[in-house]
Amino acid sequence: MRSPQALLQGDPEIAGLINKELERQQSHLELIASENFASPAVMAAQGSVLTNKYAEGLPNRRYYGGCEHVDAIEELAIERAKQLFGAAWANVQPHSGAQANFAVFLALLKPGDTILGMDLSHGGHLTHGSPVNVSGKWFKAVHYGVDPETQQLNLESIRQLALEHKPKLIVCGYSAYPRSIDFAGFRAIADEVGAYLLADMAHIAGLVAAGVHPSPVPHCHVVTTTTHKTLRGPRGGLILCNDADFAKQFDKAVFPGTQGGPLEHVVAAKAVAFGEALQPSFKQYSQQVVANAQALAERLQERGIAVVSGGTDNHVVLLDLRGIGMTGKVADLLVSEVNITANKNTVPFDPESPFVTSGLRLGTAALTTRGFDEAAFSEVADVIADRLLNPEDAAIEQRCRDRVASLCQRHPLYGPASPVLAA
């Protein structure tokens, strides 16, 4: 079955728009930290006939017939996830990281319970108690931040907050924190106050799987993640734990607690991605992701642009633009004009609103998939610096655009395996 050709013939309008998106991805430098490029194999699994199958329930315990093959696929996804992260149990059904987090909340908490998570403006996530999210509406949310001097986590200050507020759940794991996380230290705090510990490793899951970032699995009561970002799979969620009693609660919280039928085509794509991440080449890839982020941070600082915490231990580089008198909103627009995709982001103790911000968040996972190395990322840093430091210079703007085009041509996306739809 030639799906690209079928789409081209069946709906040329959608096919044309997909082609335009492919061209955009090929011709732009993707630096959004939460994005990556899934392999053709992952995309093939997600676009398969599994789209047609309903399969409410768990493998071998379904509410529908005809599930023998999706059972085998989901069991394989579960086993690969357990092997990849060294966990005793996994649920591969959550549709997203947010769904995974909410399933954990449903299993462990009651409305009004206290949760302790990182402040969104310091690098946390909406689902960790933000007042605009259900996690902040249904539960009493207390937030910790980073140290004002080091811009890194201070476990003693977090411990004092925990002792004061006695949370039922502590959340660690973030969306814009560039440093390594001491999961054992967090577990000690959780045990001291009698709290559950949830690690949301959505951003660093691939690095954890490859062993280039400490794993939360041995230390936390439960771990959630997305399956894209650094893990390079389809967009989806995953829950892991080592406790059989918790596992039963989490299974019920996913179905029927928060979801109906799982997306078995996405589950298959997750299984493919987990299989890819179990290969030795994925460890090399993940090591390169971190090396590239450190090269990017180092060169940007050499060019006079501040980096939050002075560097990075993972794939995230968070720029603090206050020193050059620029907002994140303006910087986001400036780099987009030379075909670099990033996102404005708050920085710790940011005086600007979340709609303006003082920061620009960069990530290295996607371009590392395209084969970028440290030298290429140093060049990327120069392009960014040239653009941000010379916003009114049309000649420099064009030169930046030309350098982006050259970098993209030297590091093609997908190449012969391109999922292009055009005839």
Swiss-Prot record:
PROSITE patterns: SHMT. The record marks 228 as: Plays an important role in substrate specificity. GO terms for cellular component: cytosol. It is an enzyme of class 2 (transferase). This is Serine hydroxymethyltransferase. Transmembrane segments: none annotated. Belongs to the SHMT family. It comes from Synechococcus sp. (strain RCC307). It comes from the Bacteria. It catalyses: (6R)-5,10-methylene-5,6,7,8-tetrahydrofolate + glycine + H2O = (6S)-5,6,7,8-tetrahydrofolate + L-serine. The keyword Cytoplasm applies. PANTHER family: SERINE HYDROXYMETHYLTRANSFERASE (PTHR11680), SERINE HYDROXYMETHYLTRANSFERASE 1 (PTHR11680:SF35). Coiled coil: none annotated. (6S)-5,6,7,8-tetrahydrofolate binds at residues 120, 124-126, 353-355. Keywords: Amino-acid biosynthesis, Cytoplasm, One-carbon metabolism, Pyridoxal phosphate, Transferase. The gene is glyA. It is found in: Cytoplasm. It holds the Pfam family SHMT. GO terms for molecular function: glycine hydroxymethyltransferase activity; pyridoxal phosphate binding.
